[in-house]
């Protein structure tokens, strides 16, 4: 693992547990066990580090969500939360804390949101055999985002509820009683 990847991998859990705005550079250099000079040399400032962390997390997240059905999508989301923790959407938290004053962070969050929308559209099209209408896509996206948020206080029950609701929506859309 190169030093840049090492710093990013050590910074992510610090941001996840403590927030973006509240986390100082001293805490980040301690977590990565590097000097501030090394951190700045490889990643620039805090905003660049946050963007690199968001990009790495986005890649890992979408690798996990490389599935072909809506049911598998919610199963993958639950697996992600069990592995990574259920503290709500990392990207939404970054946007709320930093996006308003850091355009680079806002751009990372926007890229994530666009990719999530595209991924869900692809999975839905695979399930339906055709592109989903915008309403159904938005409904599945709301269930996905809602489960992500709700899992922070309801645990796995949030994923079961979202998965069940998504199955009902698909059944109603396709006219199948069991799917």
Stretches found by the model and what they are:
Residues 6, 48, 72, 76, ...:
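Amphipathic alpha-helical interaction segments
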Residues 6, 10-48, 52:
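Helix-turn-helix
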Residues 8, 71, 114-121, 125, ...:
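An amphipathic alpha-helix signature
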Residues 10-17, 64, 143-150:
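Solvent-exposed, amphipathic alpha-helical segments
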Residues 52, 62-87, 136-140:
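Hydrophobic alpha-helical connector segments
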Residues 54, 58, 106-117:
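Amphipathic, non-transmembrane alpha-helical scaffold segments
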Residues 83-107:
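Amphipathic alpha-helical segments used for helix-helix packing
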Residues 104-110, 126-179:
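Hydrophobic/aromatic-rich alpha-helical bundle segments in the mid-to-C-terminal region
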């Amino acid at each position: 693992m190169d030093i840049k990847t090492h710093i990013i991998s050590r910074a992510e859990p610090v941001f996840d547990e403590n927030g973006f705005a509240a986390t100082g550079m001293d805490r980040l250099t301690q977590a990565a066990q590097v000097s501030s000079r090394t951190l700045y040399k490889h990643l620039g400032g805090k905003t660049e580090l946050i963007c690199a962390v968001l990009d790495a997390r986005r890649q890992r997240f979408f690798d996990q969500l490389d599935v072909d059905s809506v049911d598998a999508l919610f199963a993958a989301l639950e697996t992600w939360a069990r592995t990574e923790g259920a503290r709500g959407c990392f990207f939404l938290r970054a946007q709320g804390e930093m996006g308003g004053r850091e355009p680079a962070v806002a751009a990372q969050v926007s890229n994530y949101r666009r990719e999530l929308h595209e991924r869900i559209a692809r999975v839905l099209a695979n399930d339906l055999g055709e592109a989903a209408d915008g309403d159904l896509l938005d409904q599945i996206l709301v269930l996905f985002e809602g489960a992500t948020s709700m899992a922070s206080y309801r645990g796995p029950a949030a994923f079961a509820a979202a998965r069940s609701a998504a199955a009902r929506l698909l059944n109603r859309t396709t006219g199948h009683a069991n799917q």
